[in-house]
Amino acid sequence: MASTRGSGRPWSAKENKAFERALAVYDKDTPDRWANVARAVEGRTPEEVKKHYEILVEDIKYIESGKVPFPNYRTTGGNMKTDEKRFRNLKIR
């Protein structure tokens, strides 16, 4: 999924993956961190990767604060009573 929040052109999935990998290599104590990350994400400037990181951190804080609801996923494990009800209502012709 491409990200468009912030400014500039959207980030592609390939760019986001390169960005994630670069962050794993160049931690906060790395000299010239954003220049190194930008080199790993072809076509992005140090300013762009730093802004992308700041947006990511902001999003994580927002999620962790509970302001973003968890999606309501259907369970795949199955519930015996629910499954039995489904099978009872199933008519094979």
Swiss-Prot record:
Specifically expressed in the dorsal region of developing flowers. Disruption phenotype: Radially symmetric flowers. Loss of functional stamens in dorsal positions. Organs reduction with five organs per whorl rather than six. The keyword Transcription regulation applies. Its main location: nucleus. InterPro entries: Homeodomain-like_sf, RADIALIS-like, SANT/Myb, SANT_dom. One of its GO terms (molecular function) is DNA-binding transcription factor activity. GO terms for cellular component: nucleus. Residues 6-61 form the SANT domain. Keywords: Developmental protein, Nucleus, Transcription, Transcription regulation. It is found in: Nucleus. Coiled coil: none annotated. The keyword Transcription applies. One of its GO terms (biological process) is determination of dorsal/ventral asymmetry. Induction: Up-regulated by both CYC and DICH. PANTHER family: MYB FAMILY TRANSCRIPTION FACTOR-RELATED (PTHR43952), OS05G0567600 PROTEIN (PTHR43952:SF13). Involved in the dorsovental asymmetry of flowers. Promotes dorsal identity. This is Transcription factor RADIALIS. The gene is RAD.
